[in-house]
Amino acid sequence: MRPAFRPVAAAGLIAAGVLATSCTAPRPGVTFYGNRASVAVEPGLWCTLGTNQQISSCLADPTKYAHLTLGSGQPLQISVPGDLGAPWLVAFEYKDAAGKTSSGRSELFRDGRLAYTLQPPGAGTQLTRVEVQAGFVLGLDPSGATVFAATRTWVLVILPRPPVVS
């Protein structure tokens, strides 16, 4: 005896197929490691480009960032996945021993490099924020100057580790 056709089961399979085709692949994450701890973070900004290599849409989520505790002068290791897409760079903010906030950035990595160690720039400096940037496009800033804008970012907020008291 042949089983009867079940419309409910067929509808369920169709719905599952629609869901499977409408799902997007997970976006690549970046891993930060320092002070014997690691944390992975999803992109906080992810823009797609149109056929003319101009930004067609962006998903920005300011809650997509990670925290890591580092002490003054401690380095930070950064690992990016192979599908991140070269080129990429690391932008960072730090406070010097006097408490003055400054910023800097790494070189632009275009050679398939997947890891970078960020050394704090000077004795007594405390890293406070690190951002991996990728997917650069040519654009204009508010003053009309030509800039390369990142279309993908991953953010780490660094919590200062209290000094060890002996």
Model-derived features with residue positions:
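Bacterial N-terminal signal peptides that target proteins for export
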Residues: 1-10
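C-terminal motif of bacterial Sec signal peptides marking the signal peptidase cleavage site
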Residues: 18-22
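Beta-strand cores of secreted/periplasmic/IMS beta-sandwich domains, seen most often
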Residues: 71-84
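Hydrophobic membrane-insertion alpha-helices, especially the h-region
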Residues: 11-16
